[in-house]
Design a protein with these regions (language model features):
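Conserved aromatic anchor
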Residues: 82-95
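Short beta-strand elements bearing conserved aromatic residues within extracellular beta-rich modules
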Residues: 98-101
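Short beta-strand segments within Ig-like beta-sandwich modules, predominantly Fibronectin type-III
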Residues: 113-120
């Protein structure tokens, strides 16, 4: 998708798309075959939906623009232990006032739990077993904006 070049350069990139594509309209040359119209044409554009999508993109871009830099070198520990440990490089950016830990069950598509942990470079989640959850860390700015959540990329 068009978001990949941004991701490849280290920028947050998101792809927003219609999940139920109409292959008579999309990815087709404009033509009529057996009475069926094919191709992307202006009469097939839902302008109310396009307006909403544009607003969502603008809001998300503003949010990303205001957000602080994400935590670097996020690592996870706690293998064969009853608790999970996370650590990361603490930022020298004075705008970052703290960090937030996220975790969710491995079967969940959404973050279910979070904890503000202050301006520290490590945290231990007692009683949270590493095998049962996915984890992430975000940075929080003094104005309350939050970076993208970073998954651990190494173990310790």
């Amino acid at each position: 998708g068009h978001h990949r070049p941004f991701n490849d350069l280290g920028y947050a990139g998101v792809r927003i798309m219609e999940a139920h594509e109409n292959y008579n309209r999309q990815h087709q040359d404009i033509r009529i075959e057996d009475g069926i119209e094919y191709g992307d044409v202006i009469s097939g554009v839902n302008f109310k939906y396009a307006k909403k999508l544009t607003a969502v993109n603008a809001i998300n871009l503003a949010s990303l623009g205001w957000s602080p830099k994400e935590p670097k070198n996020v690592k996870i520990g706690g293998i064969v232990e009853p608790s999970t440990k996370l650590k990361w490089d603490i930022s020298k950016d004075k705008n970052i006032i703290g960090y937030k830990i996220y975790w969710r069950k491995t079967t969940s598509p959404f973050w279910e739990n979070s904890r503000l942990v202050g301006k520290v470079n490590n945290y231990k989640l007692n009683g949270i077993v590493i095998d049962n959850y996915l984890f992430g860390v975000s940075s929080i700015s003094e104005k309350g904006y939050e970076s993208v959540v970073v998954f651990p990329n190494d173990v310790f």
